[in-house]
Amino acid sequence: MKYLITESQFDNIIFKYLDMQNFYKMRYDKGYVFWESKEVWESGGNITITANRERSECFVNSDLLVEVASIFSLELNDSLNVIGAWIKTQIDFDIAEFFSDYGAD
């Protein structure tokens, strides 16, 4: 059996998935930083997302980008766009540019 869903319904599914990740979010004077968990933050682990108010830009770690793309069968650019849309619901300022470190290794 096949189901047809709208793009907004699909985005909402991805938003719920991202909400369930329970990122550890910290606000600072220039924006927000998200880690995979509080434990990752406490151990000095890698940042998952950084949203910078002054530059109006947001960094998304390639691990999250690839994870969302893989789970939901998205192209990387589409994954970045939907993660970006979700991030906008989590912060209190607008972002003009989203980027990732994908392929930087």
Language model regions located:
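Short acidic DE-rich linear segments
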Residues: 4, 97-105
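Generic low-complexity, intrinsically disordered sequence content enriched
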Residues: 8-10, 22, 69, 78
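Short, charged/polar N-terminal "headpieces" of proteins
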Residues: 18-29
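Short acidic, low-complexity intrinsically disordered linear motifs used
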Residues: 1-18
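Acidic, low-complexity, intrinsically disordered interaction modules
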Residues: 28-89
